[in-house]
Amino acid sequence: MLEILQIPVLEDNYVYLLHEPGSGATAAVDPAVAGPVLEALDARGWRLGHVLNTHHHGDHVGGNLELKAATGCTVVGAAGDRHRIPGIDVALKDGEEFRLGSASARMLDVPGHTSGHVAFWFEDDAALFCGDTLFALGCGRLFEGSAEQMWRSLERLRALPAETKVFCAHEYTQANARFAVTIEPGNAALRERVERVEALRREGAATVPSILSEELATNPFLRPESPEIRARLGLPGVPEVEVFAEIRRRKDVFRG
């Protein structure tokens, strides 16, 4: 069973340290900066063997080269993004396996936020590291991909086991919650979740990870089939991707 350490960095990023105790193998997911990662490793006596990158944005790869210089770690990323991942050593294709001691992950292509975005799914640990594709109560902006690409990616993620823990890369949940209730205000589970999110943030506590079942019940970006959402958007009878695209468009201009 993986030990997972969540490290808050920058304004709202999370870096994750994954430690497989049987072998001592350790990986860092999306290290925006190196310093806090090195401090956490030193405090626990862990040795970094790998960096896993979900995409090429600077707040996800900014610590790659410093970590590589300090630890000799191997950088793992998507084959399609090898030209944009600093220090990449191992370029995986969709569905290929990454092993961390006795733990294993499948790399999943999930384009939309960027064209080369991927996620790492540790099935036996019910843990998904999805970068900026799926957020708690939200999803990533479409910087390079289309709404169709992002929707296919989200469909892929929402088909994972409901008990999957969703480790996204940012603490955006409070802002996402304020938008979500404008899209589906009649969702009682959403309203209850918003109250919990607000309480956690008042205490300075993290709202990440979430559970996929919770996202399926409350995240509007995963719920384009909802009759209430369709009615509020004036989009009855259209394909789910069109509903998703309209939700994303509204989120892009939301100020709340």
From Swiss-Prot:
UniProt keyword terms in alphabetical order: Hydrolase, Metal-binding, Zinc
GO molecular function terms listed in the Swiss-Prot or TrEMBL record: beta-lactamase activity; hydroxyacylglutathione hydrolase activity; zinc ion binding
Involved pathway(s): Secondary metabolite metabolism; methylglyoxal degradation; (R)-lactate from methylglyoxal: step 2/2
Substrates-to-products reaction catalysed: an S-(2-hydroxyacyl)glutathione + H2O = a 2-hydroxy carboxylate + glutathione + H(+)
Cofactor(s) it depends on: Zn(2+)
Positions with a binding annotation for Zn(2+) 2: 59-60, 132, 170
EC number: 3.1.2.6
SUPFAM superfamilies in alphabetical order: Metallo-hydrolase/oxidoreductase
Protein's GO biological process: antibiotic catabolic process; methylglyoxal catabolic process to D-lactate via S-lactoyl-glutathione
Binding locations of Zn(2+) 1: 55, 57, 113, 132
Family: Belongs to the metallo-beta-lactamase superfamily. Glyoxalase II family.
Assembly: Monomer.
Function: Thiolesterase that catalyzes the hydrolysis of S-D-lactoyl-glutathione to form glutathione and D-lactic acid.
HAMAP family: Glyoxalase_2
NCBIfam families from the UniProt entry: GSH_gloB (TIGR03413)
Protein name: Hydroxyacylglutathione hydrolase
Species for this entry: Methylococcus capsulatus (strain ATCC 33009 / NCIMB 11132 / Bath)
